[in-house]
Curated annotation (Swiss-Prot):
Family indicated by similarity: Belongs to the importin beta family.
Role this protein plays: Required for nuclear protein import and mediates docking of import substrate to distinct nucleoporins.
Listed GO biological process terms: protein import into nucleus
Subunit structure: Forms a complex with an importin alpha subunit.
Gene of this entry: ipo13B
This protein's UniProt keywords: Cytoplasm, Nucleus, Protein transport, Repeat, Transport
Name the UniProt record assigns to this protein: Importin-13 homolog B
Domain of life the protein comes from: Eukaryota
Residues annotated as domain Importin N-terminal: 94-160
Main location: cytoplasm
Length: 1119
């Protein structure tokens, strides 16, 4: 903005010196001192709308009448309804009215009234929030006169801020910050000083850091000013205001930054007992400014640290009364701690530490930072020990801890000598050894990113090793199960992981349902801490075996000392488990040691055994080469499967072992023995436990290694009990438990198809057994289970979980047992079709899709054709039924309340009114059932490209018509838009003749489908016109979404290739129509260039998309 334009801001702050008294007393606070005109004070309304005020962003909302009209009483009632009413409909109406009110121009007038003319908190807070929102979103659209009024309003409010609750003061401070960011320094030249002067009774240049008695504050306004100064640097770092000139602000701030620091430091000299809250906020502001911009020289930075340390160590007397404003929330805390500003001091140092790296640090800066670090090393250990050991106060300990984390995170080798780094690390170790779980969690970010901290990585490896082992040792302590819980200790000799192969698990662990899960915060800490140290291990910061060796030695030492606390053993085993993942390089040598010492642990408990079991599952790489250990481990795992608290971990570990090809091969000779031991568990109470599925998978992996002639009887023995468990639930289950049991049994069935593959038995020996798929050992399994699953589909037609299980079974069957499945495809097809027609579910379409392959039997082709016809009819009717039930009323409401985009779409073309009647015959909302739409279109597309003889040609053209006429409604759901556009693109591409099918009959049908598509556009030119019109409208009106625009571009390109003459005819007429997108005010040259580009049918997809995207951007950028 030029200088002449600035002259129009006659009521804005002056650009020269600002008279403090005039600023404080003037009823129009932003009036220049030389201008005594007070006509702007209009009937007590602080912010009166100029007559020519226009808000471009909210034209739509301004056109919508606000009923009832806004008054203080109406606003009070609306807010009371929103927060207090029990009627949800009334709350929604109140919310809608309040949102609409906030977007009205009149809201500017009400904001100061809500803040200053009421004492109702909800009204005041709503006024503050509304003012903030309007300023952030509407400032750039306001004219000069309006901006002047807004600035006057804001300053009038802050002059009266003593009447506001503290949370409202904060919101108004944010508003003031936004106003300053928009106006400083071009419009409001002295904004920072003007605001600071609200809280001092002297010129800022006369403030003294050497003689605080010369400083005089206006404490009534000090809180607002300090809040503003604490918020401004954070908002400047975010840089999220449009059209805000951040570089200009930063340039100007560099000239005055020392005075800002001087003011904030002078506040610290106020008597602490009476001004505690002011001092706290001043520390907060100092921290924020140190993160954003350091003082101009090291001397001021040194003073900042010195004063902060001096004041931060002051002790508050027991009769402290706060700041005089009645805010005594922290008094009790201050009295009990004695040094209440230590955490504030830490906050300042933390802020400064973020500036150590990346600053142009001269020697003066380095000396100031070194002073801060040396002082921190001296004073903080005492306060940290007091906070953690004596008071157990994390709120005080965490900021101190984080100061040193931030210090050593900075890569400033000029500041941090090797000796200084070692001192910081040693101090951190002492903090870690007594720190709480929450406090030492602050190290996670540093450890995660440790490799990037060159200064730390280059330290002596022995020092780093010592540091990380100390850290791990503390992790063990703070991640133990809490003391005092009864976890049912286990008697010696009943451990499921004893080395004796004859050990029995007789239920001594627990007879009652005792919760043995970790607290969430401990579990999360374990996960994060182990991940961090794994990064250290994997990045070779220390030798890979360091942690594992330390843990095993510690475990062995505890065993030798006969430590009586199972929690300590369990914690060690957890971290061994965590470090046993990954590549396991150099770890396998420790496995036999662990397998031998774990049974020697003198005390057992359920959590301890569970962790031991989980650990064993990590060592399949070792077990696959050691038959004896493998047999012992599996034998010891099996008894744990009978215990509800252990079956999950035991089943998971067993599966981890059995998925190893070598382990399952080694276990196959013992299959009968294993099954003998497990069978009572499979048939007992645990059969409804979801973990039992993992047990079946483990056994199937072993059975997978059986010779073909031995497979059938063992498979039958394993799976046959599952069948009655399923048939017992037909027709329907009566309880949730029975329902869950049914899901478990169905999961077992599809595990068979997942693990055992037919292809592995296709090639037999010289005798040529099983040349027919019907003689395969699993053929009877499918003969039995497929009819049962058909019954389940009938009786559980709306149960998604059960349908998904059956779908998974059939899909795996088609994938891995196609030779066998060919005998059952017609039955499976009938089941899926009937079920879909009864209750449409997307996954049922996936079953039919899995059946489609290039070569099918004639009967199967006929059945699929009939199925697709029925499914298509059901699909269309389902969408129509929803439309008939809800769309008529909703559409009328949408047409009334819709945004300008949709209103303009309806007015852009004279012919569009005629299209409405045509569209009414084809109204469908494909986004109502996005999953069904997706799987239906995938199914039809697969048939089109694989076996077109499986579909009636008119189905393709019918679906295309429905999509064409509803293209403009698709954009509310991007995935559905993509699916529909891809289908339409494939269908339109048929005319280019590139799609060919190996089956001659398929090609004939494909030709018929192509003729249907041609006839579709030739019989009625409106169809092709609507296609082109809707595509162009979406391109022009869709917000700049690259993905959506590309979908429409591909449809247009396929139409350009297949039907170039129709595209030229319609696109030319539409784009040359002056009423088309008239409100966009598009340059005719841009329209013509776009038309030329989209008619190039020989363009590549990339070039075509680029042309469409460019025009879409032009259209949407003009809004």
């Amino acid at each position: 903005m030029n200088t002449n334009a600035m002259d129009q801001y006659e009521n804005c702050p002056s650009y020269g010196s600002f008279d403090v008294k005039s600023f404080s007393d003037s009823p129009i606070p932003f009036t220049n001192n030389n201008n005594n005109n007070n006509n702007n004070n209009n009937n007590n309304s602080i912010c009166v709308m100029p007559s020519n005020y226009n808000n471009k962003n909210n034209n739509n909302n301004n056109n919508e009448k606000l009923e009832p009209e806004a008054t203080l009483d109406v606003l009070t009632h609306a807010l009371h309804t929103l927060y207090k009413s029990n009627d949800s409909n009334q709350r929604k109406l109140a919310e809608k009215w309040l949102i609409l009110f906030q977007k009205q121009p009149i809201a500017w007038e009400f904001c100061p009234r809500l803040l200053l003319e009421t004492n109702i908190f909800e009204l005041q807070y709503f006024g503050a929030s509304t003012l903030e929102s309007k300023l952030k979103n509407e400032w750039n659209e306001c004219n000069v006169e309006m901006k002047s009024k807004i600035l006057n309003t804001i300053v009038s409010i802050i002059q009266n801020s003593t009447k506001l609750p503290i949370c409202c003061v904060t919101r108004v401070s944010v508003t003031l910050t936004i106003a300053v960011m928009y106006t400083f320094p071009e419009i409001w030249r002295n904004a920072i000083f003007d605001i600071i002067h609200l809280s001092i009774k002297q010129d800022i240049n006369t403030l003294s850091l050497h003689d605080p008695s010369q400083n005089h504050f206006n404490t009534d306004r000090l809180l607002m000013v300090l809040e503003f100064l604490s918020i401004l640097p954070d908002e400047l770092k975010k840089q999220d205001l449009a059209l805000c000139k951040y570089s200009e602000i930063q340039k100007e701030l560099k000239l005055i930054i020392d005075k800002i620091y001087k003011f904030l430091l002078s506040v610290l000299f106020l008597p602490i007992n009476e001004n505690f809250e002011f001092i706290k906020i001043s520390y907060k502001a100092l921290s924020a400014w140190l993160k954003y911009m350091l003082p101009s020289n090291g001397t001021m930075l040194q003073s900042c640290f010195e004063i902060s340390f001096t004041v931060g160590q002051q002790k508050v007397s027991n009769n402290s009364n706060g700041n005089g404003n009645g805010n005594n929330n922290n008094n009790n805390n201050r009295n009990s701690i004695g040094y209440p500003l230590i955490d504030s001091l830490a906050l300042v140092l933390e802020g400064s530490s973020l500036s150590i790296e990346g600053q142009s640090n001269g020697s003066c800066y380095i000396e100031a930072f070194r002073y801060a670090i040396e002082q921190s090393l001296t004073i903080f250990p005492t306060f940290y020990n007091e906070a953690t050991v004596m008071n157990q106060d994390d709120s005080k300990a965490k900021p101190i801890f984080n100061v040193f984390v931030q210090f050593i995170s900075s890569n400033n080798s000029q500041l941090f000598t090797t000796d200084l780094i070692h001192r910081c690390l040693n101090l951190l170790i002492s903090f870690i050894e007594i720190g709480s779980r929450e406090t030492i969690s602050l190290l996670f970010y540093l450890i995660d990113d440790f490799k990037t901290h060159t200064m730390l990585v280059q330290q002596d490896q022995n020092i780093l090793k010592f540091f990380f082992l100390k850290l791990l040792n503390r992790f063990l302590d703070v991640s133990m199960y809490p003391n005092g819980k009864d976890y049912c200790p286990i008697e010696n000799g009943t451990n499921p992981l004893s080395t004796s192969q004859n050990a029995q698990f007789n239920g001594v662990l627990c007879e009652t349902n005792i919760e043995t899960l970790l607290d969430d915060d401990i579990e999360q800490f374990r996960s994060c801490s182990s991940d961090c140290l794994m990064n250290i291990q994997e990045n070779d910061i220390i030798p890979k075996s360091t942690f594992l060796k330390f843990l095993i030695e510690k475990l062995n030492a505890f065993i030798n000392e006969k430590c009586p606390h199972w929690e300590q053993y369990e914690s060690i085993l957890y971290y061994i488990y965590a470090f046993s993942g990954g590549s396991q390089d150099g770890q396998l040598e420790y496995v036999p040691i662990l397998l031998n010492i774990i049974p020697l642990i003198p005390i057992k408990s359920i959590p301890l055994v569970r962790t031991s079991i989980k650990l064993i599952g990590r060592y399949s790489s070792f077990l696959k080469t050691n038959t004896d250990y493998l047999a012992k481990v599996v034998s010891d795992l099996l008894p744990a499967l009978s215990h509800a608290e252990l079956i999950g971990s035991a089943a998971s570990s067993l599966l981890s072992i059995c998925v190893s090809d070598k382990c399952s091969t080694m276990l196959w000779p013992h299959f009968n023995q294993i099954l003998d031991q497990i069978e009572p568990i499979l048939l007992g109470p645990q059969k409804s436990n979801p973990s039992i599925v993992l047990v079946y998978k483990s056994l199937l992996h072993i059975l997978h290694k059986a010779p073909i002639h031995e497979l059938s009887p063992l498979f039958t023995r394993l799976i046959s009990p599952v069948i009655p468990n399923i048939t017992d639930h037909i027709p329907r289950v009566k309880s949730k438990d029975h329902y869950n049991q049914l899901l478990v049994q169905l999961s077992i069935l599809y595990s068979v198809n997942e693990i055992i593959e037919y292809d592995e038995f296709a090639t037999m020996g010289a005798n040529g057994e099983f040349t027919s798929p019907s003689k395969h050992p699993l053929y009877p399994f499918f003969q039995t289970t497929i009819p049962i699953q058909g019954q389940l589909l009938k009786h559980y037609k709306s149960e998604f979980e059960i349908i998904d299980c059956i779908t998974t079974f059939y899909r795996y069957m088609m994938l891995y047992f196609r030779e066998i499945a060919n005998d059952f495809v017609d039955e499976i097809l009938q089941q899926a079709t009937q079920s879909f027609n009864q209750y449409p579910i997307a996954s049922l379409l996936q079953i039919i899709s899995s059946i489609i392959i290039p070569k099918l039997q004639p009967l199967t082709i006929t059945n699929i054709k009939n199925s697709i016809s029925l499914i298509s009819n059901t699909f269309i009717n389902t969408l129509k039924s929803v439309i008939l039930a809800t769309n008529n009323n909703n559409k009328n409401n949408d047409n009334t309340n819709n945004n300008d985009d949709n209103n303009n779409k309806n007015d852009n073309n004279n012919n569009n009114n005629n299209n409405d009647n045509d569209k009414s015959n084809f109204i469908l909302d494909f986004t109502i059932t996005p999953d069904i739409t997706k799987d239906y279109l995938i199914l039809i597309t697969k048939i089109l490209k694989t076996s077109p003889q499986c579909i009636e040609p008119n189905i393709i053209s019918t679906i295309c018509i429905y999509i064409i006429y509803n293209l403009t409604d698709l954009t509310k759901d991007k995935p559905t838009t993509g699916n529909c556009c891809l289908f339409l693109t494939n269908c339109l591409s048929l005319n280019n003749g590139k799609l060919q099918i190996s089956d001659p009959n398929g090609n004939k049908v494909l030709e018929q489908i192509k003729n249907e598509m041609n006839a579709l556009f030739e019989s009625d030119p409106k169809h092709s016109y609507v296609l082109v019109y809707n595509i162009l409208m979406n391109i022009c009106w869709t917000p700049t979404s690259i993905q959506v625009t590309q979908h429409f571009s591909d449809v247009l390109l396929s139409f350009a290739i297949g039907y170039p003459n129709l595209l030229k005819l319609h696109a030319t007429n539409i784009l040359n129509d002056p009423n088309f997108i008239k409100d966009k005010q598009i340059n005719p040259h841009d329209k013509q260039s776009f038309l030329t580009n989209i008619l190039k049918s020989n363009s590549t997809q990339v070039d075509y998309r680029s042309s469409v995207r460019t025009f879409s951007f032009i259209c949407n950028d003009k809004e």
